[in-house]
C-alpha cells in the first residue's frame, strides 16, 4: 500500500528541518550514514548527530551536520555528477538530482547564466548536499510515493549570503516558490530556505491544505533558530491516502514526425533528469501518411508545466495534450543484502503488506559487471539466487 507525506510548514521549511522530521518518523540515523557513504565525499569531511530539543515548549528532533570540509562552492555539474556516479539506489539518485536541478534552474534565472554554469555557494557546501541527498534517502526508506505541503510563510527582512545582503525570501527561493501557495501571516526572518523550497518544487504534488489521509506517524524537525511568533518546527505526517484520492499523476503526450532518434533520446534523458516518472515512444502514422512518433511522459501534476516547456523548446512539437490517470502501485522499499559481490541494494515489493518479490538494483549490478568484467546478465543471475533474494 502506498504511503504519502504531508509537510505542515506553519513555521517554514529548510533542508535540515526536513531531514530531522523524516528521521523522527523512524528512519535510523545509521541507515542515513551508511547510504550517504555511497557518495564520493571524504568520510572525514562531515559528521552527523541528532538530539531532542524544544522550540517554544514543543519537543522536536534536531539534525546537525558538523562540516569539517570548509569548501562551500561547488558547480551544479560537479554535484550532479557526484550523485549520478554514486551507488545510491535509482529512486534516491533521481529525487536528489531533481532537487538540485530545480535549484540550478532558479539560480541560473536569477543570475542570468546557463544552468551548466551555475556555481552553488551555501548550497554547494557538504551540509547542504547531505540535507538534499539525505531527504531522498529518508523518503525512499519510508516508502513514500507522494508528497504535499501546507501553504508556506514568506517571511520578511534580509538574509546574509555569499552574494551579500538579500531580501527575504531570497531571489532563488522566490523563483522556486512560483506556483505554490504562500502567505504573509508570520513574523520577520527567513522562513523558507532555498533548499527547503527546492525540495517542495521538485517533489511535492501540491502545496495546499492537508489531503484526506490515514495518519500512521508524525515527525517533528526543529530548525536552528527560535522565532518569536511560532515554534520553529516542521511537522511531517506519514500515512495512507483515503479512498480514491488521486496522487496527482498525469500523462502528457505529443506527436512528432520530423525528429531524429538521437534528438528523441536526448529529450528522454532531459525529462527523466527533470523528474518525469516515465518516458516512452510509440510508433504512429500521421497525416499525409507520414510515419511519426508519439512522445509520452508520466509526471506529477506539479511538474507538468516545466516538463511540457522542456518538450516544446527541445523538439518541433507545437502543443502537448495531457490528462490525469489513476494508478495501482505496489508498496516498495529498498534494502541492502549480502551477495557474492558484497552488499548490494535490492528493491522489495509488497502486496497488502506481504512480501511479493525482490530484485537487485540495476545500477549496482551494472557497476559490478563493469568493475569485474562479468556479463551483466551473469551478475543479475548470481545475485538473484533464492538464498540472496529471500535474504537467506
Curated annotation (Swiss-Prot):
Domain of life: Bacteria
Entry keywords, A to Z: Nickel
Example of a GO MF term: nickel cation binding
A Pfam family the protein falls into: Ni_insertion
Family stated for the protein in its record: Belongs to the LarC family.
Protein name, entry field: Putative nickel insertion protein
Classification lineage: Bacteria, Pseudomonadati, Thermodesulfobacteriota, Desulfuromonadia, Desulfuromonadales
Amino acid at each position: 500500500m502506498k504511503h504519502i507525506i504531508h509537510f505542515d510548514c506553519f513555521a517554514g521549511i529548510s533542508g535540515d528541518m526536513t531531514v530531522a522530521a523524516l528521521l523522527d518518523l523512524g528512519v535510523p540515523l545509521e541507515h542515513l550514514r551508511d547510504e550517504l557513504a555511497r557518495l564520493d565525499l571524504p568520510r572525514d569531511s562531515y559528521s552527523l548527530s541528532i538530539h531532542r530539543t524544544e522550540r517554544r515548549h514543543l519537543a522536536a528532533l534536531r539534525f546537525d551536520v558538523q562540516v569539517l570540509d570548509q569548501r562551500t562552492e561547488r558547480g551544479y555539474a560537479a554535484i550532479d555528477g557526484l550523485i549520478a556516479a554514486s551507488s545510491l539506489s535509482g529512486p534516491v539518485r533521481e529525487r536528489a538530482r531533481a532537487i538540485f536541478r530545480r535549484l540550478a534552474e532558479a539560480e541560473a534565472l536569477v543570475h542570468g547564466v546557463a544552468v551548466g554554469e551555475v556555481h552553488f555557494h551555501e548550497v554547494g557546501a557538504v551540509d547542504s548536499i547531505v540535507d538534499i541527498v539525505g531527504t531522498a534517502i529518508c523518503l525512499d526508506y519510508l516508502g513514500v510515493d507522494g508528497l504535499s505541503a501546507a501553504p508556506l510563510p514568506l517571511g520578511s527582512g534580509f538574509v546574509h549570503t555569499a552574494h551579500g545582503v538579500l531580501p527575504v525570501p531570497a531571489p532563488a527561493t522566490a523563483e522556486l516558490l512560483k506556483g505554490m501557495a504562500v502567505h504573509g501571516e508570520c513574523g520577520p526572518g527567513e522562513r523558507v530556505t532555498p533548499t527547503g523550497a527546492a525540495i517542495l518544487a521538485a517533489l511535492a504534488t501540491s502545496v495546499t491544505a492537508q489531503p484526506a489521509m490515514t495518519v500512521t506517524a508524525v515527525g517533528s524537525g526543529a530548525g536552528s533558530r527560535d522565532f518569536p511568533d511560532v515554534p520553529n518546527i516542521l511537522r511531517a505526517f506519514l500515512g495512507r491516502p483515503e479512498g480514491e484520492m488521486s496522487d496527482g499523476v498525469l500523462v502528457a503526450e505529443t506527436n512528432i514526425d520530423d525528429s531524429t532518434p538521437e534528438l528523441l533520446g536526448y529529450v528522454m534523458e532531459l525529462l527523466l533528469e527533470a523528474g518525469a516518472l516515465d518516458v516512452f515512444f510509440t510508433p504512429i502514422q500521421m497525416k499525409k501518411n507520414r510515419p511519426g512518433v508519439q512522445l509520452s511522459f508520466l509526471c506529477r501534476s506539479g511538474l507538468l508545466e516545466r516538463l511540457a516547456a522542456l518538450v516544446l523548446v527541445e523538439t518541433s512539437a507545437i502543443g502537448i495534450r495531457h490528462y490525469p490517470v489513476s494508478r495501482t502501485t505496489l508498496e516498495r522499499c529498498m534494502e541492502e543484502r549480502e551477495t557474492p559481490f558484497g552488499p548490494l541494494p535490492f528493491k522489495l515489493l509488497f502486496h497488502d503488506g506481504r512480501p511479493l518479490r525482490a530484485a537487485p538494483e540495476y545500477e549496482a549490478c551494472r557497476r559490478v559487471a563493469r568493475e569485474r568484467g562479468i556479463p551483466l546478465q551473469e551478475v543479475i543471475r548470481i545475485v538473484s539466487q533464492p538464498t540472496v533474494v529471500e535474504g537467506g
